[in-house]
Amino acid sequence: MKNRIEEIRKQKGITQENFAACLGVSRQTISSLETGRYNPSIFLAYKIAKCFDMTIEEVFIFDEEDLKWESD
């Protein structure tokens, strides 16, 4: 799942450290989210959107591939 976290954070002039503090996570978690190495839980995605005063849909970009289930 793609996201706009880094883009939005920079537009708002927020450092990774300050954003991490808003969310209650480490700066390393923010870095992992921004580079796509980590997908947040729905709860964390909600907190991210809330810290930006945006909706989840404005922050996260869902592709059709994100909705496909792996076959057993």
Residue ranges and their predicted role:
Residues 14-31:
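Short alpha-helical DNA-recognition segment
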